[in-house]
Amino acid sequence: MKLKNILLSTALLATLSACEDMFEPAQENNRGIEEMFSDPNYASGLLGYGYAMLPYDNSSVSDVATDDAVTNDLTSNYSKMALGAWSSSNNPMEQWQARRATIQYLNTFLSIVDQVQWSATTSTNQMYIDKLRGEAYALRALNNFYLLQAHGGWTADGQLLGVPMVFEPEDKDSEFNLPRNTFSDCVNYIFEDLDKAIDLLPLDYANISSNAELPVKYQQIGAEMGGYNLVFGTYQRGRITKRIAEAFKAQVALLAASPAYRDGSGVTSEMAANYAATVLNRIGGISGIDPRGNTWYMNTDELDNMGSGEVTAEILWRGNRTNGDADWDMGITQEKNNFPPTLYGSGRINPTQNLVDAFPMANGFPITDVNSGYSANNPYANRDPRLTEYILYNESEYKGKKIITGLYADSENKTDDGLNRIGTSTRTGYYLRKLLREDCSADPSSLNTKYHFPVRIRYTEIFLAYAEAANDAWGPTGNGGNTYSAYDVIKALRARAGVGTDNGDAYLESIKNDKDKMTELIRNERRIELCFENKRFWDIRRWNLPLNETAKGVRIEQGNNGLIYTLIDVEIRNYQDYMHYGPIPYSEMLKWDNLQQNKGW
């Protein structure tokens, strides 16, 4: 044993002697910026962080804090915030820390990108610099937008402020006690970054077949087809492109031109409409609407056969599919969470009666209109087909099973799917169907997993953005020089859904010259088309709509002459008026006296 210890000690001493400075700082595990110049993989990790930290929720989360849904998970932070727990120190919608950290990485990358040797070939190296710089600008814009959306707002002294804008890498000597830039300044800086990205990036990543197809600027520096395809070819699909940056610019403009911000943003609805039109014109405008775009999540032939980085006609930008078991990947987490109990799910997201009532009749009339033909005794008959596609209601047929949410007395129909039967039952009388794949099985004895994709931007969202902004700028039938109007877009989207197709959409025709009624319809179409995609929380706020609409449900019981439908209050929301704008984090307010808090927080 003594000999063994001596040998070990000798070996250790030899090791220490050979590596006498191994314990000096910044040697083994801490690499300096200079090392990035000759190690492109190391340098690209900074940009990779920007992608890894993209602020997109991979499932419906914030909808349960709106009038569209509740959850039976009573520990949900989003549910708690809707019930009164939202504060500057308890904020599920907070973006400050993650976005600021990501921007630091991106600023560092932008400061060194043109010093890194990305390729030994001069022309290919320059193409890499252009592409990577463009991606970094777009990602920085995206992160600043999410900061602005979550934390921009009006202060007690009447200023519309955004967030502190930082464009250089920060170090220990940097000035961190920065005031907030104005909201208008923030929007302009975001636009500047997006314009730089648009100038540097290709419309799409695609291979070329000859040097003659090279962009002129790359022909002039002697680039070759092979180098171009390496940098801008199909292998790069899924990364940010010019098309994606243009779509994002339209989203930013729509927020800034909305009622909650327009008085201080400097952005007009005309600008927002034209930015959206730029994106839509690239797919032929109205003719580019995907006939199956409203059911993108259940178009299994497209989802299962989509190649690496490819998109469908509806999806403008998406995340990657993998073979993991996590949400939205090759798995069934979404289905396990949201299938009804009889399908081995936890029934988490429960659509509200409020949302159900927003779906019109198939003839296009709202259910409150005397011409609708709606019957309170048969409320799901002859409704907008999207109601059946997005929501499971009482006696819906799904996966070969009839889903009974009513409180029937007979044993045959009395299941755990009924209202409030067990902890995983619906609280509203409805279950989620949208986003879920019907061909998945959560049955432990026959699990069946399928591909899912995190969808970041849909073309339908851009069409709706155009309709909203165009109606505000030019009225329902004006087009501002474009080839289609808000009316044209809404008519096409409703026709795709099967709404108003048998009567020429008589309701739409009756309001097409009324700007205010068209505004209501456009907002309602957006609510329906984008439900459960984490849009409603922000839409309510940017439109300055009331925050405290009570979440309602339905109790269905068997009466002597049929079913009896009784509306019920499920959650009484507890927002304050100042909560149209989110807070600056309390911890930041304690640290920096140059920060000004939004009014009320």
Question: Model-found features: residue ranges?
Answer:
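Extended amphipathic alpha-helical segments enriched in small hydrophobics
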Residues: 141, 249-251, 451-500
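Bacterial Sec-dependent N-terminal signal peptides
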Residues: 1-29
